[in-house]
Amino acid sequence: MVSPVPRVLATEVALELIRTLQSDYGPVMFHQSGGCCDGSSPMCYPAGDFLLGDSDVRMGVIGGAAFHMSQSQFAYWKHTQLIIDVVPGRGGMFSLENGRDVRFLTRSRLFTDAEIEILEPVLVGAA
């Protein structure tokens, strides 16, 4: 049996930062910002601090942290795999990496036709 293709992945440096944040804050979660105040950065919060709504989509889990975005944003990104990375800079004002001189960054690539057939399912709603 073929393994499902994940919709979201993290680089090793991103996984290391996630582990550090989990050590400092306990369980964490991500929500892909829609582009208002913090651009379109993945925002990291203590698990449960960001209130998910009925229209949020859980894309997957990276480093033990659930990764969400709005359903309307998912409509644009559903054909892409998100790759969460870390780059130098300032994190989003409310994101847990803020003040560490690094920030999470979302990179993406289009799925192949073959991959689209075996994607991991998403969960819709405050899951």
Task: Go through each PLM region and give its residues.
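Domain-level signature for proteins that mediate thiol-based redox and metal-cofactor handling
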Residues: M1-A127
